[in-house]
Structure formats: C-alpha cells, structure tokens
A protein has these predicted regions:
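Well-ordered beta-sheet/strand-loop patches within structured domains
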Residues: 25-296
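N-terminal secretory signal peptides that target proteins for export/translocation
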Residues: 1-3
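Sec-dependent N-terminal signal peptides of Gram-positive bacterial secreted proteins and lipoproteins
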Residues: 6-23
Length: 296
C-alpha cells in the first residue's frame, strides 16, 4: 500500500507509466510489475457514521485512525490490513483512553473509538463490491451502525482485511471532523450497486440491573437511601446481514453475508453510603415561651 499525495494526477501518471512500458521494471528497479487496465478512476462507494456526542478522548482516537487511512493506494491483488495501516493504538502514538468492549462490558481502554473507523471502512468496502477476507463482530451491539454490519479490531488478533480484486488501483479517502466520519473508496467504475440490509432474527431480553454499593464514596452527592443508574440494561440481538446487488435499479441477487449474536448488557445501579445529616429537633413549646417573653 502506498500513500497518495495528489489523487487524480498520481493515479493517471501511475497507471499510464505501468501499463504502457514494454519491459518488466522489476528486473531494473527491483519493483513489482502490475498489469493494470487503465480506466477512469471514480468514486465507487462511500459510507459515513456519526459521533457528535463522543468524549474528546474518543474523538481524538477516531481522528488519529482516520488520518492513517487517508490517501491509501492498494494495487490489484494486494491485501490490505487495517492494523498494519493504522498501527498500534498506544499512548505514545497519541491515542487516549475511552470506552472499549472487554469480556462483554464497556470499560476504559487506550484506543476506544477506533472500531468505529474500521466499521465505517468495512461498510464502504461492502458497497464498493470489494473482497473482504477478515472481519470480526463486537460481542455487544454498538450504536453507530446496524447489527451485522460492524467490524471490531484490536492491535492483537482482530483485524479487518480485504483484497483489491479489481484490475486497477483502489484508493481510500477518510475524513473525520469531530462529528461525521466518512470513508470513500475510489477505483474503476462499478456496473452494479450494492445495498445493505440488516435483519433482526431474535432478541435477547435485557437482564436485571446489578446493584452496587458506593463503599468508596466516589459519588459525593449520593446519600444513604439514594440510588443512581450508572449504566442501562440493554437487550441483545441475533441478526443477519444481507448484501443486495442491483443493476439499473433491478435486484439481481440478495446474499446473506453473515449471522451474528450480540449479548445483552446488564446495567448497573449504585447505592449511596454517605450518612445524611440530621437536623436538630426544636421543641415547639420553647418557641412559644420565647415569643411570649418578647411580647412582655
């Protein structure tokens, strides 16, 4: 993969140069030879998700990952790896702590929010008709995309990978402005159009709340007898994802591309432990005597 600086000029020169030279440059310049079939480079597909209510830390992580995915060129038959392209999500590289999913719970972790970038890319790739060879669902439903269309990643084992199975380069453009995240896929023109369809096939009831006690008194306004919801119980889902192919508005095929199960989320309620300050009782007879004496 290569980073493109000037999109249209680079592609035009690159395709022309590679396609019309009559000998293999690999023997001269030690670089691979690609048998491109130059065509007009167009916007094949785009997809966007939103994140206006995210924390500043999560927004930072999204923007860092999006920047790593912008102006990326993938030549024919080349494999793309999200993790290799974006790199490790560490504090040293500027990533912040935000909510991630671990063992079926939302917890704080460095790089929280990057999965929204991989998910947005995943959907753009589907709409662009490219060959996805690795993706992973979340264990819990996420709010920024329909069930069966998410793509979880982490720096360890979970990646998002696809192959450019077209005859020409594919270029990724990625934009994040603090509210909207958009991925565009450029390449040779598509004859068909793809539509996503998410189908809920079953629902997992939301569990009862877990009751916790604020023994460390982390909530300064939570007194004995008070209770506060710190996370909501949510239902889980069983779902299927379909990719519908159309040509000139006519449905050609509808293919089930995946089936998923998302666990229900158990919410948490915390009970206060701070003692209430009792107001001193005042004898009403004393007040009456005091008033009488003042009148005298």
């Amino acid at each position: 993969m290569k980073r493109v600086k000037i999109l249209s000029l680079t592609i035009a020169v690159f395709c022309f140069f590679i396609s019309f030279v009559e000998f293999n440059f690999s023997s001269v310049f030690a670089m691979p030879f690609y048998d491109f079939q130059p065509k007009e480079i167009v916007l094949r597909a785009e997809f966007y998700t939103s994140y206006p209510s995210s924390t500043d830390e999560r927004k930072t992580n999204i923007m860092l990952a999006a920047k790593s995915l912008d102006n990326i060129l993938i030549v024919p038959n080349e494999e793309f790896s999200f993790n290799k392209t974006v790199g490790e999500r560490t504090e040293k590289r500027g990533y912040k702590s935000a909510k991630i999913i671990v063992n079926g719970e939302f917890v704080d972790g460095v790089g929280g929010g990057v999965c929204q970038v991989s998910t947005t890319l995943y959907n753009a790739l589907l709409l662009a008709g490219l060959k996805i060879i690795e993706y992973h669902p979340h264990s819990l439903p996420v709010s920024y995309v329909a069930p069966s269309f998410d793509a979880m990643v982490n720096s360890g084992w979970a990646d998002l990978r696809f192959i450019n199975d077209t005859h020409n380069p594919v270029i990724l453009r990625t934009f994040a402005d603090g509210s909207i995240l958009k991925v565009q896929v450029y390449g040779e023109p598509l004859k068909e159009k793809f539509i996503r369809k998410s189908v809920i096939t079953g629902e997992i009831p939301a569990p009862e709340y877990e009751i916790l006690t604020d023994t460390l008194r982390e909530f300064s306004d939570l007194y004995e007898g008070d209770m506060k919801i710190i996370s909501y119980s949510k239902a889980g889902y069983k779902s299927e994802g379909y990719l519908i192919k159309t040509v000139s508005g006519k449905v050609i095929s509808s293919t089930k591309i995946r089936s998923d199960s998302y666990s229900a989320v158990r919410g948490k309620i915390i009970k206060g432990t701070i003692p209430r300050v009792k107001e001193p009782l005042i004898d009403s007879t004393l007040i009456t005597v005091y008033r009488i004496k003042r009148k005298i």
